[in-house]
Structures are given as C-alpha cells and as structure tokens.
C-alpha cells in the first residue's frame, strides 16, 4: 500500500474516533432538568409543600393514553418504530464535528491529487460513514459526476423523509396533548357537577382533578413532546448539512480539484468565525 494510502487510512481512523463516540445530548438533558426543576419548585411553592396534590395517576393515564393512542392511530406502525429510534438517536447522537469533517475531506483530496483516485480505495473500505464510503467508492469506480450527485442526493432526501416521520410522531403527540387534557378536565367536571349541593370537600377535590388534567395536557405539549419534536427537526438538518459537505467534497475530489480549492469550497459552508478558527491546509 502506498504511503499516501496509509496516511489516508490513518486519518480515517482518527475520523472514526471523533465521530464514533456516543455522547448523551447534554443540552437536551440539562434543558429538561431546568424546565422540570423550575416546574417542581413552582408547584411546591404554590402548594406550600403539598406537591402530592399535582400527582394524579388516573389523569396521567387518561391524558397520556389518549394522546399516545390518537398519535398511533394517525401513523403507520413502521413510522412509530422509526420515531422511537430517532428519539434514541437524539439522546445518544454521534458528535459530528463539521470542521473535522472538512479537514478529512481535504485530506482525501490531497491523497487523490498526489497518488491518484485509486489510492482512496482503502479509505473507502474503512470510512466509518456509509454515505462517505459510497461516495468515495463511486468516485473510485469512475462513475459520472452527475450520477454520483443523483445517487447521493436521493439518499439525503430519503433520510430527510424518514426523519420527518420521527418528528411527526412527537409533534402529533404534542398537538393532541392539550385536547386530551381538556377531555380529562371535562371528565372530572362531570363528577364535580354530580356532587353539586353535596360535600364541598368532594367538589373541591373534583375541581382540582379537572385542573390537573388540563395541566398534564399542557405539560405534554410544552415540556415533553414539543421539545423532542423540535430537537429531532434540528438534528435532521444538522445531519443533512454534514452529508451535503460530504457530497460536495466527493464531487470536488472526483473533478480532480486542487486540495486548496476543495478546502475553500467546503469552508464556504462555515461561518466566518468557524473559518478563522480552522487551520489552513498545507
């Protein structure tokens, strides 16, 4: 194996280490801790420590079950399974550093420029990203650039379509939450009105249950499903952004562009601050 191929393969290993570490999405975790911590303190303060007044298992089952059932009824089973996988991926996502990705693509361009495109064959086999692996292999095979772009573009669009199902699941759950909270509220109010003229304590307890049901619906929308749907949408855009960089890098390598040109082209995806922080290719 040529020295250029060995260097590219070693670079690929470093890329695998940088991208392959599963990290809990700290922003998601800290965000939920902050939101629920603030809610818990507010409820504790408002109830003078009687936090148990906000815990109604029956209402949790009613609101959660109704919202989940309505969401499942609106989607096919494979989309629901995909949504759960997307949620797991959101929590334990691979930290893809765009700056590092650009650096690796420039390294591949240097190898192809110096030793020929065929020198990337080892890199293509060992590339950790299947999308990158396919792009490099198509380049090595001498595939027409228009066909390469068409194949890789279809894969990006298919990925985005799959991600839409994951976002749709949690967005639907958020949409149905307040309505199901209203159902819980009305259900409790029926019991309350049946006891009008009776024990005031019973009426008060029924009214409290009604309000808690409404609260659960709002929480499901704003502190559970809604943020997940938004985060899934953001993650999808980030992944598509990284794949677009890979696509443009592969096409530039296939065209035989100078590594400096490849670097400048891919750097245009970054902000001026990110560009200034990146070391220039030799």
Q: Model features per residue range: what roles?
A:
Residues 12, 20-22, 26-31, 38-166, ...:
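Large intracellular
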Residues 1-23:
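N-terminal amphipathic/basic-hydrophobic helices that include classical n-h-c signal peptides
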């Amino acid at each position: 194996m040529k020295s250029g191929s060995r260097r590219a393969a070693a670079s690929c290993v470093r890329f695998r280490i940088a991208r392959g570490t599963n990290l809990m999405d700290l922003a998601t975790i800290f965000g939920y801790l902050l939101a629920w911590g603030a809610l818990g303190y507010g409820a504790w303060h408002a109830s003078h420590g009687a936090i148990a007044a906000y815990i109604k298992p029956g209402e949790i089952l009613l609101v959660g079950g109704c919202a989940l059932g309505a969401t499942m009824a609106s989607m096919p089973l494979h989309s629901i399974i995909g949504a759960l996988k997307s949620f797991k991926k959101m929590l334990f996502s691979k930290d893809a550093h765009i700056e590092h990705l650009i650096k690796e693509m420039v390294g591949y361009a240097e190898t192809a420029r110096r030793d020929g495109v065929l020198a990337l064959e080892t890199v293509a086999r060992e590339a950790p990203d299947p999308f990158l692996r396919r792009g490099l292999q198509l380049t090595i095979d001498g595939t027409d650039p228009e066909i390469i772009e068409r194949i890789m573009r279809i894969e990006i669009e298919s990925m985005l379509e799959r991600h839409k199902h994951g976002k749709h699941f949690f967005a639907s759950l958020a949409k149905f939450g307040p309505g199901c909270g209203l159902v819980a509220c009305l259900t409790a109010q029926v019991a309350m009105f049946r006891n009008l003229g009776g024990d005031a304590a019973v009426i008060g307890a029924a009214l409290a249950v009604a309000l808690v049901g409404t609260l659960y619906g709002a929480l499901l929308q704003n502190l559970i499903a809604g943020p997940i749907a938004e985060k899934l949408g953001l993650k999808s855009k980030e992944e598509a952004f990284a794949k677009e960089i890979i696509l443009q890098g592969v096409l530039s390598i296939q065209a035989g562009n100078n590594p400096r040109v490849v670097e400048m082209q891919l750097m245009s995806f970054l902000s001026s601050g990110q560009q200034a922080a990146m070391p220039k290719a030799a």
